[in-house]
Amino acid sequence: MNNLLARHIAEARSALASRRSFNKVFGIGGHKTGTTTLADVFTLCGLKVGNQVEGELTSYSARRGDYSKLIAYVQNADAFQDSPFAESEVFIALDALFPNSRFILTVRDPEDWFRSQMRFTAKRFGLADGNQITKEHIQQDQYIFRGYCAEAHAYAFLMRTPDYKFHSSFDVGEDAIEWEKLFNKDEYIRAYLTRNESIRRFFRGRPHQLLEIDMTTAETIENIAEFLGLPESLSKVPMPHANKT
């Protein structure tokens, strides 16, 4: 880290400590929209970022209507991204549970987003082509625990009657899941765009609470720093692009 960047970061942390005007910051963009990069930006800005695996573990209970673990988790840090914040309409609950918070909707070109989803998942299973991904790959994934990824994936994209509410697809039965839609581009992009639009509608009239940003094209953290009320000196800090797929 060069001396100038170190000074900018120190100024940001000092500003947050002395005059922070918000409660929490939630990255609510879907997976593969720059959420890892956003976590790095939060750290650069002097925010304590919630542990991602701990956050993912709260998804399981929150989908079933139990928010106690999610609340306890959020109380112990400043900024969050990925699951469960990238899922469905959890942003509505967060807005009610943590007043005066800020929300960042990370977006990217829908076609690029879908290709990134396929590449990431194929790589996870050692496949050369995303078209080789099967229901069995998803169901047998051991990440967190067996069944975690299958539930999350089905919940996000494969519901027979998708309403994108924060409930568990598995609670309404396996027959509610349309596995034949697995990585169907049109279905996935529709779900992606539908959720983004629901976020925009919910925060309409509250521009101070929602920032929408394409992390793949942003060259600096200027927009995020301005949104959080950080010093102008951070406007030239480069965007720390991470985990590209």
Where are these regions (language model features)?
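Conserved short-loop catalytic and cofactor-binding motifs
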Residues: 26, 187, 212
